[in-house]
A protein has these predicted regions:
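Short S/T/G/P-rich N-terminal loop/turn motif that feeds into the first structured element of a domain
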Residues: 1-52, 59-69, 85, 89-93
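Short, flexible helix/strand-to-coil boundary loops that buttress conserved ligand/catalytic motifs
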Residues: 68, 77-80
Length: 93
């Protein structure tokens, strides 16, 4: 199994409708071959601003690498660059 977790710190000037659309895009990119679990949502803790979490589990590292190289992921990553900064945690278990 391979785990991929991302925390997106959304920029303060991003509108709520734009953020909602981005969350929908992030949710959709998890519907892919090799993804065994996929959760995306807005953190309940807003002390550091709006934070979106993405928590994905993949069958293995090969499945993750294929997903990451795919066009849907690249497209949503490019869009998220305009809305947020992020931290990534990836590990095998």
């Amino acid at each position: 199994m391979f785990r991929h977790v991302v925390l997106f710190r959304v920029r303060d000037d991003v509108t709520d409708p734009d953020l909602s659309a981005a969350i929908d895009e992030l949710r959709a990119v998890g519907d892919a071959l090799g993804v065994t679990s996929w959760r995306v949502g807005l953190s309940l803790d807003k002390r550091k601003g709006r934070v979106v979490f993405e928590d994905g589990t993949f069958a293995d590292r090969v499945a993750f690498e294929a997903w990451r190289a795919g066009e849907p992921h690249r497209r949503v990553a490019q869009h998220m660059e305009t809305l947020a900064d992020w931290l990534v945690g990836d590990w095998e278990h």
